[in-house]
From Swiss-Prot:
InterPro entries: DUF520, UPF0234-like_C, UPF0234_N, YajQ-like_sf. This is Nucleotide-binding protein BLi01194. GO terms for cellular component: cytosol. Pfam families: DUF520.
Amino acid sequence: MAKESSFDIVSKVELPEVQNAIQTALKEIGTRYDFKGSKSSITLEGDELVLVSDDEFKMNQLKDVLVGKLIKRNVPTKNIEYSKLENASGGTVRQRGKLVQGIDKENAKKINNLIKKSGLKVKSQVQDDQVRVTGKNKDDLQQIIAMVREADLPIDVQFINFR
């Protein structure tokens, strides 16, 4: 009997890469003319980004710079959920961005349904914050990977533990 192959579908954000992106974004903000004298800053508190700027316009520019740096470092920007803008001290505005780690139940169900609708001979099961896909044919598994990549999911997914 053929050995079963498997892989895991996960959704992770590499925190060291986020920290590096923040450092390069802060460096760029320090040299940009439109940020001269601005109280703009970006910090990482646990798994949450905290952006502080003078006003809403500068906040949007700050986010654009940060997103550009995150993309260069291959950090999925889909996995950042921003809160509403709030007033901070000193006439500044603050916005928090939560870094989503893992696949929640709702998205795991979407992935499971997508795999079941494919009609391929594979099994999928939800394990905590990841989805494991097993099957005898490696070609079927590769088709599942391609299909999940093409799917319009609200989170970014990675594929690990190929066996």
